UniProtKB/Swiss-Prot annotation:
Disruption phenotype: Deletion of the yokI-yokJ operon has no visible growth phenotype, however it is out-competed by wild-type cells. It comes from the Bacteria. It comes from Bacillus subtilis (strain 168). This is Toxin YokI. It is found in: Secreted. Residues 1-235 form the LXG domain. InterPro entries: Bact_secretion_toxin, LXG_dom, Tox-SHH_dom. GO terms for cellular component: extracellular region. Keywords: Coiled coil, Hydrolase, Nuclease, Secreted, Toxin.
Length: 571
C-alpha cells in the first residue's frame, strides 16, 4: 500500500536536485579536461598513436555531453515535482492508501448500518405512540448526502494519488532510453580501444566507434533530450507567467514593480486593462525623462493611471471594447451604439472642459495621462505595447529636450510611442500637460469611442492591431515570408491583414506552425528559419494547413488573401 507524504517527497527531490547540480558541475569540468587533451596541438603531441589518443578523448567529450543532457533532464523533472503537487492541491498532504481503502470503507459501511438501525428503532417507538401523538420519522437524506460526498471524496483522493504516482513514474521513465544509450555507447567506445593487452587509447579506432549501430542513434537521443527540455522550459515559463499574473491581479501598488512584472509576463499575456496601465506607466516615466515634472503632476499621473487600471470596469478601454459588458457591470441597460457614442462623447467633452480647460496642474496631468494611455492602448494593442520602452525612442525625446535648454520644443508624442499613428499633438512649454494639444487629444478619444459599434466576429479579416479581445488576431506567416522573398515588399506592421480567431482556433494554428518549425529547425520554439529557402508553394501549403486547423471557411481565406496581396512597396 502506498503512503504519500508531500514533505518527504519534496525534501528528497530538493536533495537530489542539489546532488545532480553538483554532478553536472563535475561533468562540465571533466568535459573541459577531455577537450584539452583532444585539442592538443600537433607540435606538442603528434603521430598515429597521438591521433588515436586525441580522437579517444574527443569522443569522450561527446559522451559527457550525453551525461550533461541526462542530468539536465533529471534536474528539470525533480524541480517540477513541487508544481505538480501544487496543481493536484497536495503540496502539504499526508495520505495512507490503506486508510482510504480499508478503515474509511469500513467506517462508511458501519455508519450507514448504525443510522439504519437507529431509524428503525425510532420508527418502532413512534408507531407505539401513534394513536396518542402522531409523529413523522426524521429524514436521513442530509446524512446520506454528506456520507456519499465523503465517500466520493475518498475515491477521488485515491484516484488523485494513483494518477500523480503514475504521471511522475511515466515522466521519470523519459530518461531511461538516455541512460541505456549512454551505457551501451560508452561500452562500444571502450571496446574500440582494442582487446586484451592492446586495449589502450593508443590503439583506439574512432571509425569502429563512430560507425557502430549504437552510436548512429545519438542524433535521435539528442533530439529526444532537446524536445523534453523544451517542453519543460515552456511549462516553467507558463507557470511563472501564471504566478506573476496572479500577483498583478492581487494588487501591486508600486508602479515600477508593476511595470517590471508586466514586462516579465509579456504584454501579449496581459488583460487589456493591465496592458493599458503598463502603457501609461511607461508613458509617465518617459515624460518624466523628457522634462521637469512637478509633484502635483506626478500625483495627477498616478491618479490617471489608477483611473484606467483599477479593477472596476469604468475605463474608456473597457467601455469601447465591450460596451455591453461595461454598462451591465455598472448596473445600466445596454443602449444603442449611436447613443452609446453620444454618451461617451459627452462625458469626454465634460471632463475636458472641467479638467483641462478650467483645471489645475493636478487635474490636467491626470486627464492627459488617462487620455494618452487610452488612445495608445487602443492603437498599439496588447502585443505591440512592449515597444514603448525602446531606448532610441526615449533617447530622441531627451536629446531634443536638452538641446532646447530643457524646454520641450519640436518634440512629438509619436517619438514616445514608436508604433503610434500620427496624432499631431503639439509640443510647447515645459511640463507634460502643457506639451499636449489637448483639443486634438480629446478628438482622438472621441474617434476611438466611435469604433464601439463595430463588432468583430470569428473569421473576420482585420488589422493585426488593435486586438479584439476575447478573439485573437492570427498574424499568419505570409508577412514574414514576404519580407524576405518579395522584392520591394514592406510590412504594414499593425495594419497587416489578419484573421480573427477564438483562442482555441488560434492555438490550433500555433500547433501546426510549431510542428513545421520542428521539421525545419529541430525546435518547436525559438528555431531560426532561413525564410529565403522556403518556396512560395511551401508557404502557401503551410498557410492552408494553419487555416485548416482553425476551420477557416473558404470565403474568409479568400478575403484574407485579397487583403494581403494589396502590397505596400518601397519607393
Amino acid at each position: 500500500m502506498k503512503v504519500f507524504e508531500a514533505d518527504s517527497l519534496l525534501s528528497e527531490a530538493d536533495k537530489r536536485t542539489k546532488e545532480y547540480k553538483e554532478l553536472r558541475s563535475q561533468m562540465v569540468k571533466l568535459k573541459k579536461a577531455f577537450k584539452a587533451v583532444a585539442d592538443l596541438d600537433d607540435s606538442k603531441f603528434s603521430g598515429k598513436g597521438a591521433d588515436n589518443i586525441k580522437a579517444f578523448y574527443h569522443d569522450h567529450v561527446g559522451v559527457t555531453d550525453q551525461w550533461i543532457d541526462l542530468i539536465d533532464m533529471k534536474i528539470v523533472f525533480l524541480s517540477s515535482i513541487s508544481a505538480k503537487l501544487e496543481d493536484a492541491k497536495m503540496s502539504d498532504a499526508y495520505i495512507e492508501e490503506s486508510f482510504l481503502e480499508h478503515e474509511l470503507v469500513n467506517a462508511y459501511t458501519k455508519s450507514k448500518s448504525i443510522m439504519s438501525e437507529q431509524k428503525k428503532a425510532m420508527k418502532d417507538i413512534l408507531n407505539d405512540i401513534n394513536d396518542i401523538l402522531p409523529l413523522e420519522i426524521f429524514s436521513t437524506e442530509d446524512f446520506k448526502d454528506k456520507l456519499s460526498s465523503a465517500d466520493d471524496k475518498r475515491e477521488k483522493t485515491i484516484d488523485k494519488i494513483n494518477k500523480l504516482d503514475e504521471d511522475l513514474k511515466t515522466e521519470y521513465a523519459e530518461t531511461e532510453q538516455n541512460e541505456q544509450f549512454i551505457q551501451q555507447d560508452f561500452k562500444k567506445l571502450q571496446e574500440s580501444t582494442g582487446k586484451g593487452k592492446n586495449a589502450t587509447p593508443i590503439h583506439y579506432s574512432a571509425k569502429a566507434y563512430r560507425e557502430s549501430d549504437i552510436h548512429k542513434k545519438k542524433g535521435d537521443i539528442e533530439q529526444h533530450s532537446e524536445a523534453y527540455l523544451t517542453v519543460k522550459k515552456e511549462e516553467a515559463k507558463e507557470r511563472e507567467i501564471k504566478e506573476l499574473k496572479k500577483k498583478l491581479n492581487d494588487g501591486v501598488s508600486d508602479p515600477d514593480e508593476y511595470l517590471e512584472i508586466a514586462k516579465k509576463v509579456g504584454y501579449e499575456n496581459l488583460e487589456p486593462a493591465q496592458v493599458q496601465l503598463a502603457v501609461q506607466i511607461e508613458q509617465a516615466k518617459q515624460l518624466e525623462g523628457a522634462g521637469e515634472i512637478t509633484w502635483d503632476i506626478v500625483k495627477g499621473v498616478g491618479v490617471g493611471l489608477y483611473d484606467v487600471g483599477k479593477d472596476t470596469v469604468t475605463g474608456l478601454w473597457d467601455f469601447i471594447t465591450d460596451p455591453g459588458e461595461t454598462l451591465s457591470a455598472l448596473g445600466n441597460a445596454v443602449i444603442h451604439p449611436v447613443k452609446t457614442y453620444d454618451a461617451i462623447s459627452a462625458a469626454i467633452e465634460e471632463s475636458y472642459q472641467k479638467d483641462m480647460v478650467n483645471g489645475d496642474a493636478y487635474s490636467r496631468s491626470r486627464w492627459v495621462t488617462y487620455a494618452i494611455g487610452s488612445v495608445a492602448a487602443a492603437v498599439i494593442g496588447t502585443k505591440g505595447a512592449g515597444a514603448i520602452n525602446k531606448a532610441d525612442a526615449a533617447g530622441k525625446v531627451i536629446n531634443k529636450a536638452s538641446q532646447a535648454g530643457k524646454k520641450i520644443k519640436d518634440v512629438k508624442i509619436p517619438d514616445l510611442l514608436p508604433y503610434n499613428p500620427k496624432y499631431d499633438l503639439a509640443m510647447a512649454g515645459d511640463v507634460p500637460y502643457n506639451v499636449v494639444d489637448g483639443e486634438n487629444l480629446k478628438n482622438q478619444l472621441m474617434s476611438f469611442a466611435k469604433g464601439s459599434d463595430k463588432e468583430v466576429k470569428p473569421f473576420d479579416v482585420v488589422d493585426y492591431r488593435p486586438s479584439n479581445s476575447p478573439l485573437e488576431n492570427h498574424h499568419g506567416v505570409m508577412d514574414v515570408w514576404a519580407k524576405h522573398n518579395v522584392p520591394n515588399y514592406v510590412s504594414r506592421g499593425s495594419n497587416t491583414p489578419t484573421v480573427a480567431l477564438t483562442k482555441e482556433q488560434h492555438n490550433a494554428t500555433k500547433k501546426v506552425y510549431r510542428e513545421w518549425l520542428f521539421e525545419k529547425t529541430g525546435k518547436k520554439v525559438g528555431g531560426k528559419v532561413n525564410w529565403k529557402e522556403v518556396s512560395p508553394r511551401e508557404i502557401q501549403e503551410l498557410t492552408e494547413k494553419m487555416f485548416d486547423a482553425a476551420n477557416v471557411p473558404k470565403e474568409a481565406r479568400q478575403q484574407y488573401y485579397n487583403a494581403f496581396n494589396q502590397y505596400n512597396f518601397r519607393k
